Amino acid sequence: MTDTTKIGLKETGCITGYHAHVYFDADTVEQALVLCQRAAEIFGVKMGRVHDKLVGPHPMWSCQLAADPEQFAQLLPWLALNRDGLIVFAHPETGDELADHRDHGIWLGTGLELDLSLFA
């Protein structure tokens, strides 16, 4: 069997959790709120504040869902099926915020440009 670290592959044991950021605007805030509340109810994930302003590296208003790896395995497909046009950006938490946002992110819908300058 090949040692994956010798060919640059990373082990997933460094992932302590995931964040899924649901993006919205003034017209879709209610839709995003319902989606995030249902996700929290169904999967037991932690729902963060609903930000009706830009926060962190995010280019749109957003609400964060925080999940452990087991929850995320169920949450991501559910978000894919139920986002109804909302954009979702998800990333692992490995302790390297820049790489997690820049290199390890998953987009549901149109990928947007993040402001990564705060991780420099």
Where are these regions (language model features)?
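Long, contiguous binding/interaction regions
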Residues: 1-120
